[in-house]
């Protein structure tokens, strides 16, 4: 998941200010049905709304709100607040039409606001440091420093649990984001924290020392909160949109985009890339950046592929004969003009050319980011086997242009259940799935830790990123 603190060019920053400009006017917002403008309050969160590495707004709820506003032909304005209470106040003053901030339905109803349709349900985790002994059940939290965020909806459940476990105690903290709460847990301020799965899943790759001990015996229903003055026409339009988004796969694809890959890596995998990054990546960074210039593919994605393939080992060789940083086969190396697969620069440029070729070979109607994830599967098992998986996805009633549907079809390549639609025969489809999903995770980590590369901005700079003296 991209960092919440993304540096961009001046133009991107200006756009961000426009998108997140706080309303200076406290007058009630006119209904979107008459004004043609949908005003939404949100919070900056990797699960909800953030600025991506390309300077564009993104996030699970962001994508759904954007689709809703487009379906109604309304313009869209965002107001960002750091606390749910501030969003609730704006709703009560009718300054915004709805709030989208991973809000539990129970919290919305407790505030006597209008709950939109349920978007999805998320488990509630008890998260601890893996260096400590994992608490076993609620009884194991006795005597522990436990914390949760005020307004998260966890208080009522804890009060009910305390009736059976009177020794249970906790700190209810405010003015922090879930990411900050996890950082405090990792730093030792608390022994365990309560956080919903939506928030933890979005950040688990950045806290390899934390893990889920167990889930509390309830799930949270995530909804959008509507202003008390919302018209029936607005509520009905929202209900129809959510119903359609659930049936046509829009919600499924959004969940896949932001959360579908985040549980693939184990703690050792995350620690591995964090430890090897300062040791091995510096010698390869300029080659990955050159490959970006030639292919147009983000160098951090190419570096993620290189890590998945060889852990950035330029001399890597497998028993099957694939070699080098990008672990190219002899045939692929010949096609891409690579004469020495153990030459790091040649291997990286060859891998970038190959991925660009695979992306270009896909039908033009396939949009990003699905286009890239599908190309990664083809990078691992070949274009022909990817096309078989797309045919299987379609035969199963899915969308062959959606990674969310094709990823479910990939394992069938090794089962033969759909042999009649498989032109290219058996393949290790599950391996292609793991390959693509691992790379997505490594890419998320590198997006957070490594700056973007702009060849024009970096023109004339040295290896340290600084301009020449004088």
Curated annotation (Swiss-Prot):
GO terms for molecular function: peptidoglycan lytic transglycosylase activity. It is found in: Cell outer membrane. The active site is at residue 309. Keywords: Cell outer membrane, Cell wall biogenesis/degradation, Lyase, Membrane, Signal. Its EC number is 4.2.2.n1. PROSITE patterns: PROKAR_LIPOPROTEIN. Pfam families: SBP_bac_3, SLT. Residues 25-262 are annotated as: Non-LT domain. GO terms for biological process: cell wall macromolecule catabolic process; cell wall organization. It comes from the Bacteria. The N-terminal domain does not have lytic activity and probably modulates enzymatic activity. The C-terminal domain is the catalytic active domain. NCBIfam families: PRK10859.1. This is Membrane-bound lytic murein transglycosylase F. It comes from Thiobacillus denitrificans (strain ATCC 25259 / T1).
